[in-house]
Amino acid sequence: EVIIPNTIDGKKVTSIGDEAFYENKNLEKITIPDSVTNIGNAAFSGTAWYENQPDGMVFLGKVLYAYKGIMYGNTNIVIPDGTVSISKNAFCGYLGLTKVTIPSSLKKIGEYAFGSCSSLRDITFSNGLTDIGDKAFYDCYGLTDITLPESVTNIGNNAFEGCSRLKNIVIPDNVIIIGDAAFCNCENLSEITIPNNITNIGKEAFLGTAWYNNQSDGMVFAGKVLYGYKGVMPENTSIEIPFGTISIGNSAFCDCSNLTNVTIPNSVKYIGKRAFRNCTNIDNILIPDSVTAIGDSAFVYCTSIDNVVIPNSVTTIGENIFGHCTSLKNITIPDSITDISYGTFSDCTNLENIAIPDGVTNIGEYAFYGCENLKNINIPNGVKSIKESTFNGCKSLINITIPEKVTNIGDYAFTDCESLVSLVIPNSVKKIGYRAFENCSALETITIPNSVTSILESAFDGCKNLTIMGYKNSVAENYAKENEINFIELIKKIITGDADENEIVDVNDVTYLQRHIAGNKNTDELPLIDESNKDVFESVDLNKDGKLDVQDVTLLQQLIAGNKE
């Protein structure tokens, strides 16, 4: 038996993954909470519970998990009221299915739920449905007409791809996203009605439709979205996007290497994913202050762009948006940005200086990977982690200050930073990752505090002239000895109440003192606090009675509370 709880570690359980209990042959009873709305592919296949279910629709809680057994021709399915979602692959490939009625309680149709149901001719949706998953009706080429309810907000990738007999579609006003290839190869789809407020239309959403084939060469619009550019673009083309356009669609100008200049009007709010990907001859881009978001990889491989100003109106920039912009020298990031995502400036080999706004709290993996001419960069105080390969290959980076809130330096974080000479790790850092400073050949000194409890393998490989500065019997000293790195011992700064000797007095010192009083030992089977060290002992013997006990714990708690006030 398995009982899925409502919450795990304080987080509501909403999903059960693919093959989560697959082939668990002894599993006879399953209880799931109402919070679960998504059950993955084959999550319970091969279990005794599933084998004992009668043929037909199989439910788990309020989720239609699967259809079991043989389905004969001309089958009409009425999904019962109260069902909130249809799971991934639930009816996939059932050729006998011809009609489906969906209740108003249903919110989501999962991936491939009706995929390849080629005899499906009639589907009745009810208002209440919000999410049509990826490939939900893929290759349902028996469908000729569908009416989507006004409640729908998301049409997934490839949702109706290959529905070759579908003739017209009205996209409801509440739809926010039409996914990549959502109606691709619906070759008889000639009429498409798109609301004026939609901004996000995916790559090739209408490719291969009669509607698209009937469009003239040049810019193609779907509602107020610049959907794409059709036909062969002449050399040295300049594009002026008309005012009133509210969005540049995903991949709209992708691979338009003949595009040299583009004028974006002040009506555009969103620049889509890959919108200008690999437009290698655009050398300048002016982003108007109407834009609020720029999608992933929007300008990736625009190798001629040398200067970009992101206006204050922009609050979101996607992953890898300027990756491989090898001519980019100057970039202005506004204070409105709080997150620099994965690979944002990766391989911008000519980028020399960048000012990161103080409000930024996250710098993603590979954000500045391969920026070999980057000399200086500021990391804002709100950043809590230096992630994997964030500054890997920044060969010209001379110095960098790691802020006091950083707790982790990720794998390869500063690998091949050949010009970095010295570095001080703050007291907040607990872990230095695998090969974090590998081949920092000019690195002469690094100061590592007692807060660091883990230094992973090869963290300083190739740092031939390195001296590690740290404290006696610390992880830093042990690492230096094990790897034959020169070590200089620092004199500990004695601070009243600093039981764990990391130069920070906080609640961790209370726990440390309590553990010492209880008789806990360190890894060398020595007492946690060296009571023979007069200075250390006196710093935690707060009532000065010559012994460490619960009275000192109480005084330490009061000291910390007073510091916070």
Regions found by a protein language model. Name each.
Residues 17-20, 40-45, 88-90, 110-115, ...:
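Consensus positions within tandem repeat domains that build extended binding/scaffold surfaces
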Residues 396, 416-419, 438-442, 454-457, ...:
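Polybasic, low-complexity, intrinsically disordered segments
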Residues 491-565:
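Cellulosome-associated attachment modules in secreted, modular CAZymes
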